[in-house]
Amino acid sequence: MKIKDLIIVPFLALGIVACGNSSKQSNNTQATEKKVTVKAPVFNADSAYAYIQAQADFGPRVPNTQAHRDCGEYLAKQLESFGAKVYNQYADLTAWDGTILKARNIIGAYKPESKKRILLCAHWDSRPYADNDPNPKNHQKHILGVNDGASGVGVLLEIARQVKQQEPNVGIDIIFFDAEDYGIPEFYQGAYKQDTWCLGSQYWARTPHVQGYFARYGILLDMVGGKGATFFYEPYSNRTARSEVKKIWKKAQELGYGNYFVQQEGAEVIDDHVYVHTIGRIPCVDIINYDPTCEPSSFGSYWHTMNDTMENMDRNTLKAVGQTVMDVIYNEK
């Protein structure tokens, strides 16, 4: 992902006129329905942490490497073991420098027959460049990508495990996007091209795993396991999936995770959610770490460095994100 230059977009206030109903019984029924809240399963942060560790144990999951191939097999088998119908999308994608990437999007579908669907996604690849590392000698080394990549996948694997045991009312699709982090490096002197990022999600949005695929909305998890992480409204999400953003952050407040989910806008980013929406036409919310006080990067001091390792993971952060997402999807009708 990449921070985008600030864009200010005015919002148009829309007036909504509600039709009255003289029936007291109808009004009472509606009021009762609004109060019903489904108790979601308990998200296990230890389990999510273990799935993150398992990915890290393969090493950097950079496309065209053995670690990448081995981890892809692991992820597909995990989803299958959790009862999902698994789809594999293999594609040759062209990187910014002309490298052909042997990419693989991995999709796990629950209740594939249901027309009511929610999309949950994260990227599973590691960045091939530690181009934000304070040591220039590391700039062309592969990063481990524990928070940036593995954390979102780990949370979704734990959600998949829970969905196998207790399915929500709607169909769930979990997608692990590939080749998200192969964008133009900081040391490149040529013209910047936004679409060199998020290659896997661009491919999926153009050629979804199911013809005519559509979901009510999506939730993207990116860098969701760091110590002291905070998640602000991501501006693109807040413009294009505003009601979903409000719903997720409100749920986090209700669950006691307001110190993680900050009800303010952060920085706009280029991430998979942009292409899920612009190409796939599905509104998608990016839950992504944002630290306005961090000097090296608002994504955190170890973003795109050799220090994106397990030492930075916090089970409390994983719990806050995972439980919030689960409570949201289990209360969909």
Regions inferred by a protein language model and the residue ranges of each:
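N-terminal capping segment at the start of a domain
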Residues: 31-71, 82, 295-312
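A non-catalytic alpha/beta surface segment that caps or lines the substrate-entry region
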Residues: 60-113
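Bacterial Sec signal peptide processing site at the extreme N-terminus
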Residues: 21-33
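Active-site-adjacent substrate-binding region
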Residues: 217, 224-333
